[in-house]
Amino acid sequence: MAKFTLSNLTPDLYQQAHSQDMTLSMLLESLDPATEGSGLDAFERLMKEAGILTKTVRDKNIFSSKVDAFYRTNENKILFPEYVARTLVQAMTEFPIFNYLVATRTPIDSNVYKASYLDWDDTDNKKAVEMRRVTEAADLPIARIKLGDTAITLYKYGRAVEASYEALRRMSLELFERHINRIGTEAANNKVSEILTVIKDGDGNSNAAPKHKAKDLDSSFSAALTKTAWIKFLLKFYPYGCDTVVANEDGLLQILEVLYPASTVASKMDELLAKGLNVSTTLPQDLVVNTTLLYNPDIDKIGGKEAIYGLNRSNTIEEIFEVGSTISEADKFIRNQTQILTISENSGFRKIFKDGARILTLE
């Protein structure tokens, strides 16, 4: 039997969640955890109890509820802001390029954030993180993690939708979700532009991405990316690996030319070795691994030369978002029946490790 039902739902739960750096969904789940195999989290169980259907199942002749379902009771009204927030966040985080660039999302209760960094530029600190042998009487070296000098500022991403209360309440939730998804996709696309800027220039804490020129990696480089330059660039990520690459159209085409060269004697030999002779090679260090190639037209040239961004996804970008920033305007809309519904999220981005990303310029 459920521990938490609609009768327990009050507006104060949003403030309670906010004070604990939690979303309402997180708080509800902590109060009433899902049992193994239930398939629904605490918020979804409350939606089910309220009789609010968000999806149409045509083959069973079941249709999604209308937005009006959130107006039926005071408890249903409380569910609406979190429903909008969940739908928006899902659309943003599932946007393909965004999903591959962000390592983690961290909730905070403010619109500014001071991140912690392991200072690799400090020689003593860099030596301290090396797990080298020490004598029995010697102290272990201390690696220091410190707060960044510059705070990360959060910005609002989203849209304000002008629509009458009457028009929206009669819209099916399935169609309403499509509108929110469109807004979420556009917001995620705007976030990607900011992420790429943080990768390239840093977040204000002296952590711009190291840059490498193709000609310094391969003396035979002239204009087009070479296999030697590409592999040497990937090896710069040692001891980790470059698992994600972002480039514009020209950069992406040059990478594909290296990965899938035109039919030549060399490529035929590669094919024979791989198939005819049944010989394979492994690189267990994951330095040259399966790489996700991402296209983005916002990758600008650097010094007039094409730039290719490489990163280890787990070590590069953290998104910080303000808990409750998606909530207040949706709450005003349904309570006051206003004509402007603001669907947005306050968030910012910071660099986890300076060398988590590197840039290759084709020069």
Predicted regions, residues:
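Assembly/oligomerization interface modules of large self-assembling protein complexes
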Residues: 68-157
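Short, aliphatic-rich beta-strand segments
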Residues: 159-163, 246-248, 339-342
